[in-house]
């Protein structure tokens, strides 16, 4: 029955937040930098959350580069766009590195009982500054190859992958966190370029989840992708055959204001085909949904339990300290190589 993912204000769970976590429609929790002061504190916080809701899906944006919420006590994962340049264009080497970095990112989170990182970014590196080096490359074939390797590393640690931001945010200058992003390109450009990483990785069964973009593609559909049944049901579900979990991007972002207040945004996202909606950085917004929204009677067709870790695989990975240590050294090597260029 759980359709909502929310967040916390600080380093522990308040009584009011504990009450929200107990609500039957809350099935997920996303953590941010403000919820982290040290690895030990994070583990304690996760234990506190699990005592309240043992099966809740705990997620974080931990892609690497500038989008890594936990730093002290964690390895600094390089930006995905630095991998191929650091390998001097050697794709075989870059794929090997991407796999090890995916493993490292995932195992460090799983060791703290965090289920999921919303990763990898499958956007192409175009004109979008909010994407930039979060993307593996400007070329679809390179994104596909490197993302697949990164996802395979995540899977070897026991973590599923969530590709974002469908069908592609890389060719939009506006930041959908603070503005309504509009991609004026023709459908042909999107389908021949941006959508290819999603298409290929879905076909290969590599994606357990997808997060759509709060971007309008007016030459294709008048609604932002995350509120569009055309994009989510006709294209993603029917044409591409995706059978995993669709997460909305944060309904608090400016790019979501298209659909009105939180009640309107939640309804539009669920009607379009999202299985779980995210509301971040807005406790009153969460409360308005918990108290005033008419939730569906049926459970999500694609429950977030599909994204719970492979416990047996994680147990094996946690024992592989040599791989973990080697991956840390690799991450540091790539970081140093990029710093030397600056």
From Swiss-Prot:
User: Which residues are recorded as binding substrate?
Assistant: 61, 69, 134, 164-165
Give me the Gene Ontology terms describing cellular component: cytoplasm
Major subcellular location class: cytoplasm
- MF terms (GO), sorted A to Z: beta-N-acetylhexosaminidase activity
**Belongs to which family?**
Belongs to the glycosyl hydrolase 3 family. NagZ subfamily.
Q: Tell me the function of this protein.
A: Plays a role in peptidoglycan recycling by cleaving the terminal beta-1,4-linked N-acetylglucosamine (GlcNAc) from peptide-linked peptidoglycan fragments, giving rise to free GlcNAc, anhydro-N-acetylmuramic acid and anhydro-N-acetylmuramic acid-linked peptides.
- The domain of life is Bacteria
> Which keywords annotate this record?
Cell cycle, Cell division, Cell shape, Cell wall biogenesis/degradation, Cytoplasm, Glycosidase, Hydrolase, Peptidoglycan synthesis
Q: Which EC numbers characterise this protein's activity in its record?
A: 3.2.1.52
Q: Which gene encodes it?
A: nagZ
Keyword flag Hydrolase: yes
- The record lists the organism as Shewanella sp. (strain MR-7)
| Compartments, record wording | Cytoplasm
One of the protein's GO biological processes: cell division
Among InterPro entries, the record links this protein to: Beta_hexosaminidase_bac, Glyco_hydro_3_AS, Glyco_hydro_3_N, Glyco_hydro_3_N_sf, Glycoside_hydrolase_SF, NagZ_Beta-hexosaminidase
Q: Where is this site: Important for catalytic activity?
A: 175
One Pfam family in the UniProt entry: Glyco_hydro_3
Q: Which reaction does it catalyse?
A: Hydrolysis of terminal non-reducing N-acetyl-D-hexosamine residues in N-acetyl-beta-D-hexosaminides
**Which biological pathway?**
Cell wall biogenesis; peptidoglycan recycling
What this protein is called in its record is Beta-hexosaminidase
Q: Please list the residues that make up the active site.
A: 177 (proton donor/acceptor), 249 (nucleophile)
């Amino acid at each position: 029955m759980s359709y909502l993912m929310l967040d916390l204000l600080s380093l522990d769970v308040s009584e009011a937040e504990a009450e929200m976590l107990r609500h039957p429609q809350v099935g997920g929790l996303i953590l941010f930098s403000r919820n982290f002061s040290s690895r030990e504190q994070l583990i304690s916080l996760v234990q506190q959350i699990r005592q309240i809701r043992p099966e809740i899906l705990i997620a974080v944006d931990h892609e690497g580069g500038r989008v890594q919420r936990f730093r002290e006590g964690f390895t600094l994962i390089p930006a995905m766009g630095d991998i191929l340049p650091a390998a001097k264009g050697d794709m075989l080497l870059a794929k090997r590195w991407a796999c090890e970095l995916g493993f490292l990112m995932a195992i460090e989170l799983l060791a703290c009982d965090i289920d999921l990182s919303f990763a990898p970014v499958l956007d192409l590196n175009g004109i979008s500054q909010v994407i930039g080096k979060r993307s593996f490359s400007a070329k679809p074939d390179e994104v596909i190859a490197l993302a697949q390797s990164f996802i395979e590393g995540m899977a070897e640690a026991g973590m599923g992958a969530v590709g974002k931001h469908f069908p592609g945010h890389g060719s939009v200058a506006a930041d959908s966190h603070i503005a309504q992003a509009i991609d004026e390109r023709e459908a042909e450009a999107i389908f021949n370029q941006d959508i290819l990483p999603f298409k290929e990785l879905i076909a290969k069964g590599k994606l357990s989840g997808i997060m759509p973009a709060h971007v309008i593609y007016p030459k294709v559909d008048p609604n932002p992708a995350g509120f569009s049944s055309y994009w989510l049901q006709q294209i993603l579900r029917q044409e591409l055959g995706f059978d995993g979990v669709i997460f909305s991007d944060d309904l608090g972002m400016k790019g979501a204001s298209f659909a009105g207040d939180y009640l309107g945004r939640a309804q539009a996202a669920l009607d379009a085909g999202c299985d779980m909606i995210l509301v971040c950085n807005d406790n009153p917004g969460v409360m308005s949904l918990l108290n005033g929204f008419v939730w569906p009677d049926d459970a999500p067709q694609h429950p977030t339990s599909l994204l719970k870790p492979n416990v047996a695989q994680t147990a094996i990975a946690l024992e592989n300290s040599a791989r973990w240590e080697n991956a840390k050294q690799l991450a540091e090597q790539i970081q140093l190589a990029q710093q030397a260029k600056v």
